[in-house]
Amino acid sequence: MDEADGIILITLKDLGCEIEENETIKNFDSEMVYKCILAYLRVINEQKVINLTNTLPKNMSARVNACSLIANIIKDSGYRSELSYHNLLYPNVNDIRKIFIFLGQLLPKKEVESGGVSIQKLEDQICQYLQGCVKESWIPYFCPFSKRIPGNYSTATLFTTTGGNLRIPSRGRQLKVTPGLEQYYSQYLEPLTLQTNRFEDIAPSVFEYNLSIYAEAQERDNEWNDKGVSSGMNPIDYRKNKQKQVLSKMNDSIRQSIIDGGNNQISSNCNSGDSFLDIISEFRGNSLDVGGQFNRKKAFTNELNNNNNNNNDSTTNTNKVETEIETEEQRQLKRQAEIDALQSQIDEISESIQLHNKEMLDFLSLMRQSESENLEQDQQREVLEKQYKIKKKTFSLLDDAEGNMKELQSLCNQTSSNLLEMSGEWEKVRKPIIEKYRSLKDKQNNQADETKSKLDRIKEMRILIKKLVSEVQQKDDQFQQLQDQYKQAPKDSNRSQYTRRILETVKNIKKQKVDIDKVLLDTKNLQKEINTITDTAVRTFELVKDLLYNDAKKDQTAKQAIKSFAIIDDKFQKLFKTIDETGNFQNNILNLNSKIEHVSQKTNTLNSDRVVQDLKNIKSENQSLIKQIKTLIETKN
């Protein structure tokens, strides 16, 4: 019972009942029993107890009504034992335990865990796997990338698409890294069947897409086998290093193209055939680029050459050396002037770059605005073209209005007749399809029921297996404990003691058997004596009766003897009945004593003082209600 009480307490805690750790079912009062049963019923069927309060009412009549309603609900659920409101108001441990066990069996089954994985987790894993399979692009069975059927695929036919590259939704880390990519895939990306111009190009496009992915993967594997293994890095670091190298090369090439394009003149309007260098030089924003880096270097070197030439001329002309010799301070001043001029040129160039960048941004915004306006104008043009075509057709039909009306009427009649024929044909096709659908649906429902029943059986078997495993483990532990105790027990015990005890128990059993046989023999002998005595008494009574009747004809005293004998017979019969009744009464007394003991065991927790107090409360409530009724009647009169 302690194990059952422990399971019940755990279940009640799971249902949300506030139970202390050291509390047991024996300590439950009527308030606690009401809360616990209400928690059970709310999980089983909340609609039936939706009107009941969370706590037991203080009013006695309301208590009786609430407990009666709960008792009726439990009986309707299939409870077979006797149950009434007094079983809940004055709880008994055995009755409450039975009720809790019954309600626990009606609770909805929880998830049965097997191997540490619940059914809900298994269903989530299946859903994730199926979602991943749906998101993946279809791969033909003969494609090596699918890794399904090994073999030689050199004879596989490759297809090319005329509808452009396909856009397949990607998954994994790219969705988390790229913001808005998942929204684009779910809301704006067209389905695979609409990305091609023709329906016939869908399969070839898919084949080409899959083979291109396989080719890229093969190239990556070949590159890794050729270069990556010798680099001493793992594949992830090798890819990152390669990406960095590619980005650095691109940056260097762009930077070099910008530097090389600094000396070129940039036209204001770029044609569609302009090169990448021209576009970059245009974005630099200076057509002449007077202050370019290489122009400045060239000018600076030319000035140095001129200065060197002048110095050579001064050395040749010995007469002008003294007048043209420059001091160190003058040189520094000249260099400072050159540096200031270069700095001013740099500032002008940076300002011009900023201005041209602003102009470029304005140009881009204007270009986007013009593109949006062009799209709107194209849409308006398409709408106007449709309206123009409709109006053109209507105006062309106005010349012969009556004839055209007749033709339209005939076309309408023909279309209506075609629709009727098609509806009839559709009904012919629809009926077998519906019947087949219904049969398949019924079959599916039956299969679902069978699978459900099988799953329930599997769950029950798993529970049983777990119980058996736990029992086996307990038995193993018990066996191990007993074995340890046996090993630790003293080995000097004498075998004669055990044999003597066994012999004593056998002797006691034999003595008890002899006593039982004696009692049975005495009862048999007593029954025989009773039977013989009753037989002799009946025979003597009949004999005496016959003798008295024979003597009564001759002797007057015999008649008086017959009367006294009849009185004795009547008293004897009464005595016999009283003896039988006393025996029956004694048997009934024994039965009633056993029942009283049984009932006392049930009602050992029943408090008579509490019942008397409740009775007094009910009487006081009844008196107050009677007074209220009288006052209401008097007020109405």
Swiss-Prot record:
Residue ranges the record marks as coiled coil: 322-489, 608-637
Keyword Plastid: no
Gene Ontology molecular function: cullin family protein binding
Domain of life: Eukaryota
This protein's UniProt keywords: Coiled coil
Swiss-Prot/TrEMBL GO biological process terms: positive regulation of ubiquitin-dependent protein catabolic process
InterPro entries, sorted: CCDC22, CCDC22_CC, CCDC22_N
Keyword Coiled coil: yes
Similarity comment: family membership: Belongs to the CCDC22 family.
Protein name: Coiled-coil domain-containing protein 22 homolog
